Amino acid sequence: MENKLKLEVITPYGEVINEEVDEVYTTGAEGDFGVFPGHCAFMTAIRIGSLSYKKDGQMHYLFVNRGYCEVLNDRVLVLVGSAERVEEIDVERAKAALARAEERLRKAQAGETDIDLARAQAALERATIRIQLATKLIPR
């Protein structure tokens, strides 16, 4: 695997990516970072956002939920709650999720419900980022 990285993206539902790639980019707890072959070993938390990778000169994009990333010996292991290829995001479903999240957040802030405010904010963030990624990166 000379000058390549082994990228594995795994969720509780199974493996999403298992490929040899040229480079990987995502958003960690301390900000965005990139990984290239020969990168030093490290581990970080992953924030809700995008994960992109270059393979054979072409960029590929995923939505990723919170999780962890380990870089070790030219291997990038990403363990996240969920991951979805951007081209597979159902924008209408994401918009419906956004509307539900906004309503739950409104009710939680007004004290009208027992909904956990942090969960409502996380749902809003997930829906917003999914829509942004799908509409900006994939022509519809």
Curated annotation (Swiss-Prot):
GO terms for cellular component: plasma membrane; proton-transporting ATP synthase complex. It comes from Thermodesulfovibrio yellowstonii (strain ATCC 51303 / DSM 11347 / YP87). Produces ATP from ADP in the presence of a proton gradient across the membrane. Belongs to the ATPase epsilon chain family. CDD domains: F1-ATPase_delta (cd12152). GO terms for biological process: proton motive force-driven ATP synthesis. It comes from the Bacteria. Keywords: ATP synthesis, Cell inner membrane, Cell membrane, CF(1), Hydrogen ion transport, Ion transport, Membrane, Transport. This is ATP synthase epsilon chain. GO terms for molecular function: ATP binding; proton-transporting ATP synthase activity, rotational mechanism. The keyword Hydrolase does not apply. InterPro entries: ATP_F1_dsu/esu_C_sf (IPR036794), ATP_synth_F1_dsu/esu (IPR001469), ATP_synth_F1_dsu/esu_N (IPR020546), ATP_synth_F1_esu_C (IPR020547), ATPsynth_dsu/esu_N (IPR036771). F-type ATPases have 2 components, CF(1) - the catalytic core - and CF(0) - the membrane proton channel. CF(1) has five subunits: alpha(3), beta(3), gamma(1), delta(1), epsilon(1). CF(0) has three main subunits: a, b and c. Coiled coil: none annotated. It holds the Pfam family ATP-synt_DE. It is found in: Cell inner membrane. It is a peripheral membrane protein. The lineage of its organism: Bacteria, Pseudomonadati, Nitrospirota, Thermodesulfovibrionia, Thermodesulfovibrionales.
